[in-house]
Amino acid sequence: MNELSVNDAFDDIEIESFDFIWEEWEEYKGDVPLWQHIFCGSIAGLMEHVFMYPLDTLKTYFQTNGHMKYNMIYDNCNTINNNNNNIYRGNNSSYKNTCDKNYKDMNNHRNMQTFKRNFCSSTNCDKCIINNFCKYKTNCYNVMAALHTKNNRYIHNIAEPLKNMANYKINTTNNNNVNNIINNNNNNNKKKSRNIFSYPSHTKQYRNVTYVVNKKMQQNLFNNYISNKCINDPFCCRTKTNVLNMKKDIHKFCHLSKEKYNNVFYQNDTYHPNIYGRKRKTLCRNKNNINLFKNHVHKKYCHSLDDQICHSKIKEDMRNLQNFKNYTCAKNMKRHLYSTVPFFNLKNKGNKNITLPYKEIRSKYILKNGYKSMYQRNAGYYKNLIKMQSAKKNRHQLLALRKCLMSEKKYTIIKNEPFIIRKKKNMRNEYFIGNMKGRCIINTSLNSYTLKRNCLDYHHFVNNLKNICYSIMNICYNIKNTILINPSLPINNNNNNNNNTKMDTFIKLINKCLYNNNAHKIDHKILLSNYLNLFKHTNYSYYYILNNFLKNNAPCTSRKNEWNIFSNFINVLKNKIITNNVDYIRNPNVRRNQILRNNYLYSFLRNYNKNLKRNTHMILNKLTSFKYSIPYIKNKYSNVLINNINTNNNTYSNRNVLNSIRYNNIYKNIMHPIFFPGYYNTIHFRYYNYFSRIIDDKDKGKNKNIINISTKRNNCSSIIRNNLSNLYKGVNVVVLGCIPAHALYFSTFEYSKKYFSRMTSNNSSLKMNNRNISTVSNDIKSEKSNFKLYDLNYFSIAVSGFLATLVHDLIITPIDTLKQRIQLGINKNSKDSLKLLKQNGIRSLYLSLPITLLMNIPYQIIMICTNEKMKKIYFEYICGLNTQNNKKNMENKVIDKVHDETRNQDNIGKDIKNDTYNMDKNGTFLRNQEMINKENRIYNSGALEKHVTSQEKEDKILQSVKQENVSSNNDIVNFYEGQSIYNNDAHNIIRDDINKMTHKNLENNIDNTINSNESDVNRIDNMTNDMNKECDIFSINKNNNSTVLYDQIMKRLEMNSSNKNFSLNFHDKIIRQESSPFEKENYNMNLKNIWIDNYKNDFFNKPFNHITSYFVCAGIGGGIAAVLTNPLDVIKTRIQTECFQTKGFNFFRIVSNIYYREGMRSFFKGSLARMALCIPASAVSWGTYETMKRFFKINFNTT
């Protein structure tokens, strides 16, 4: 089909009780005005966005990982704001006002889980919500964020946080234990005040320090702060050159011998000797070039790249070097850096001064444009080399992380390797949880697990960190097999002096289970507290611990399943064992080593107060280093580390991140335990505190339900449950944008399809397939026709959809960006969103336009093509247009009847039909003498005596018939010539056919006129039979297009020549009289509607069901298009929510980040939600538009 739609094909269908006319593409001619398209499109867009807005909100949540992570920042800010002794409130009033205001603003969105790690994660900009509250903690967070990015191009963001941190003063105390910290809370004499950058007393650090350098070598605020502090010192800064060098790159000026291994150019092909020894690996292809460059850069006591290249003032710097080495420059730099970075240090047990380790990263040198003249050939090469060095440092950390997690050195992680833990199908030692009768409780959280491999080696238990996890899981497994809970047993607790009653009860419970309430002990009992030394940082590098303790290759596993087993067991202990006294029933089949493993748990629990609980308080103190760490201890359940446990680690557990250096960009989620610098401590520390929270009895009634391990689904359900209005946030912005967008969308679509329809060569909607030709007589053949819709022209549909989508997205893209940011809580309301235009400009609202077009263009094309195809199928097969096979027997009967009646025709009628008439060029008929003689014979015959009239009356009748036929003939020919349906070659054929048809029709009209007073029905049958014969003979030599044209012309002539008071039965079709389309010289011809009664479906004949087809077909098209374009929609949503304040984005980098961070499945996040959104949205939009347009056409546009 060369048309763009199938709507024109349905003009040949008439529905009873409802004038349901499908509009033809080529028949607009002002039929539907422009304002009606705009009005209908506006109503359709409003209906779509308002009713579907809740589903769109949920889709946005699913595609952005479902929720805003890290709610502990809220708890942190809440704790600080509720603390009356807050150090910032007393010393800085501006902080008080800012923090209070920002906290209230963010707390309004708390129900929506509005906080995300960083909404501008692509650039780590400082205008995100994360930088607007909890000043010091936020600045520490930003420092950590800058130190954990893939490249050092984000490191310039460290300057502003350090500047903010330098404005505050903190109170510190030198305590030896936790009790001193609590006792000193009321002792103001022991408080010591110092600046945040001042140097606290600390133990000697053996790790070398490398400092952060700005990417473009701009003057770093942090370096300025240090240089200004030392500017008056005669030993440090004797000349202005030293000050300038310090401002440029202070750590290069302090180029000590111990730090040479941290220099990028020096360590181009070697590992750090303190970590990996002297093992060398080549990273550069051309080693001679890099060595040549080192000779230029690394001369003896050369301190800055600028001085080295310029070869100036080297002697002056050398004279000042020794004095500068012996003074405080390098030491102060070390102290400042590690005193500002929060880091876990489990080694400190309270007997030494508080120390905070630091993050070690490599410096980055950038060659300026002015240096390219000397090193024009190699400047770009060395730039890339610097990036490789930075990536290599990250790779070293990944290698250490891999050893810590997987206990292997050379083998990569196999993605689909079977888990070590598997469910035991047939378990002999069954366990029961229930009442005294032993009735088994279904749906319990206890599950039977066993180890697939025997990974326990008690002699080398300390040498393998993984065995700690395995032993804990075996403990869980064996206790589940040996404990039978009996709630009927009484609780025996005689120790009333101990405050920690629940802990004592639990220990006694385990003692009863392990030793049957006896006092004997096992000699070879291993204390789990000794293994905690593996989690501590030592004075030397932690790589040393990993290389010495992680030598055994343990099989790979999934940490997610391991910890799920452990957490399930802990929940059982909380819900069953602690709340009910337990009687020990020892199974004689239990092996001896199982008792030993149970003893591990007992040892661990017995040393609970002495080890884990104390470390909890100390780590909190070391994390903050300030006085307000005490409220964390008092209000422990508001603590970040205890109240928020991240168990959603499945994005990393089965992925090999060490195959390529470019995998370093997955470390955007810096608070994730895998990516956090203290991961070696925090991953175990978190779960141990998880264990302690369940066992500890403090605030039992208030905090028994505080364990909130939130997931994406729980978050969305909590949003709906807490406040349904959250699903409609931002709907006012969408209403203002969807009305003009959809009005232009539908108007552009309608007029573009009208334009392309005129360019097609064939505008006919229906074609008649020539099938089943049967013989009526020896000379006449009758053709049975099969109606069928032409095929769709998908190219024209695609072009129309493309133009409409382009206009639509230019308007809706900025609205969609603002809408999604309001949905996620990034902006509070529409006014707050509009304020961003002043800061970022309107260009920031169109960042996602390319990806939006890339998504919407294929979506709209697929949806429109599917919609048109479904409507074609609906009206072809359901409505019976293509069911001619069912009519076969009826047509044969009609043809036989016509054949019999033909033989019985009157001879006079045959003579009249054989007469010929001449037609001139203008279409007028000429009478010859032979015709006049025949008329005289007919007039004088006895058979026509009753119908004889005067010659004048006959002349008047003939003249009227000739005028009517001539005018009708000219109108038809002029109409089809004006429409340019056929080529010029076809015009002559059509005119000849019309002349023949008009000649035969004139003869029949003469018969009807002469015999008007005769009430003989056979005359009418004869006339009909003659017309049928001519139609059959005519259709044999015609193609499908001319057949349709001939059929329409015949119907028109039948109406003009027949009486208006009766209908003519023609081939079993009911031809209904319509108003004349030729009035007032209007050539917009409305062809008559045909409905086949034998194939009419009563159900689909109802107007409501036909209107429903609009919605059903559009909904099917929207669902198919939604699934196919969902990956592009995910990318669009990420760009709109995460790259708002950037000047641009790299499409392939964003796609690679999503893939390597979350896997291929992340591209299909929210597919079901998007289908649930797009199916009703498309149905409502297109169904409403088509229904409204049809309403206007029937009621306002008909004449």
From Swiss-Prot:
InterPro entries: Mitochondrial_sb/sol_carrier, Mt_carrier_dom_sf. GO terms for cellular component: mitochondrial inner membrane; mitochondrial membrane. It is found in: Mitochondrion membrane. Solcar repeats lie at residues 792-873, 1109-1191. GO terms for molecular function: ferrous iron transmembrane transporter activity. Glycans are attached at residues 92, 171, 208, 268, 326, 353, 443, 499, 539, 649, 708, 715, 723, 763, 772, 914, 922, 965, 1013, 1022, 1041, 1056. Disruption phenotype: Attemps to generate a knockout failed. Pfam families: Mito_carr. GO terms for biological process: iron import into the mitochondrion. It is a multi-pass membrane protein. The chain crosses the membrane at residues 32-52, 730-750, 795-815, 845-865, 1111-1131. Keywords: Glycoprotein, Ion transport, Iron, Iron transport, Membrane, Mitochondrion, Repeat, Transmembrane, Transmembrane helix, Transport. Induction: Expression is modulated by the levels of iron ions in the environment. Its main location: mitochondrion. Belongs to the mitochondrial carrier (TC 2.A.29) family. Putative iron transporter. This is Putative mitoferrin. The lineage of its organism: Eukaryota, Sar, Alveolata, Apicomplexa, Aconoidasida.
